[in-house]
Amino acid sequence: KIVSRWMGSQNNHQQTHPNHHHHLPPLQHHANNYFPMPLSTYYPPDSSVPLPFPSPAGVNSTQAPFNPSQFCFSHRRKRRILFSQAQIYELERRFRQQKYLSAPEREHLATFIGLTPTQVKIWFQNHRYKTKKSKKESKNSPSSSSMTSSSSASNKVASTTHSPKVSSNGGNGSNTTNNNNKPG
C-alpha cells in the first residue's frame, strides 16, 4: 500500500516536472550546477603533479561515478609557526604596553624580533581574544580565577617578573607600577 502510494507520487512528480531525469547519475544530472566551466586537471592534496579530472560533459559508463569527497579543492593551510622564547617575551612585553599597534609599529616590532608584520598582527589579535576570554571567565568564577592565573602564569616566559604581584608591602614592588594602572 505504501509502495503504491510512493509510486503514484513518483509518477505524479514526473508528470508535473517532466524535465527532471532521476535516472541520470549525479554528475550528469547536476554537472551544470557544480561545474559551470569544465575542469581538466586537479592537484591532489599530497602531490604537485596534476591528474586528469573527469569532464562533466564527457562522462562514459565505464568510469566510476563521481564522488566529490575524493577531490580536495581547498588550499593547504600553512604550517603553524612556533615562536622562540625571546619573540614571545617581546610580544608579551609590548602587549602589556599597548594592546593595539599601528602598521608602522607592527612593522618595527616584526623587524626587531624577526617575524613578519602579519605574524605580529595575528599574535596580537589572538592575545587580545585570550585576555578578553580569561577576564570574562574570571568574572564568572572568581574562586577559580586565582588558580587559572597562577597556572597560566607559570607556563608563560618570564612570568615571575611580569605577573601581577600580590604582596604585603602595599604593592611597592619594582614591576607593579604598570599593573596597578590596569583594571582588575
Curated annotation (Swiss-Prot):
Composition-biased stretches (Low complexity): 140-161, 174-184
Lineage top rank: taxon: Eukaryota
Compartments in which it is found: Nucleus
Sequence segments annotated as region (Disordered): 1-29, 129-184
Gene3D superfamilies membership: Homeodomain-like
Coiled coil region boundaries: none
UniProt-listed GO biological process terms: cell differentiation
Molecular function as annotated in GO: DNA-binding transcription factor activity, RNA polymerase II-specific; RNA polymerase II cis-regulatory region sequence-specific DNA binding
Keywords associated with the record: Developmental protein, DNA-binding, Homeobox, Nucleus
Known tissue expression: Expressed in a segmental pattern in the endoderm and in the cephalic nervous system.
GO CC terms in record: nucleus
A Pfam family it matches: Homeodomain
InterPro entries for the chain: HD, HD_metazoa, Homeobox_CS, Homeobox_NK-like, Homeodomain-like_sf, HTH_motif
DNA-binding residues: 76-135
KW DNA-binding (keyword) present: yes
Family: Belongs to the NK-2 homeobox family.
PANTHER family, per the entry: HOMEOBOX PROTEIN NKX, MUSCLE-SPECIFIC HOMEOBOX PROTEIN TINMAN-RELATED
Protein purpose: May play a role in patterning the gut.
Name under which the protein is recorded: Homeobox protein LOX10
Underlying gene: LOX10
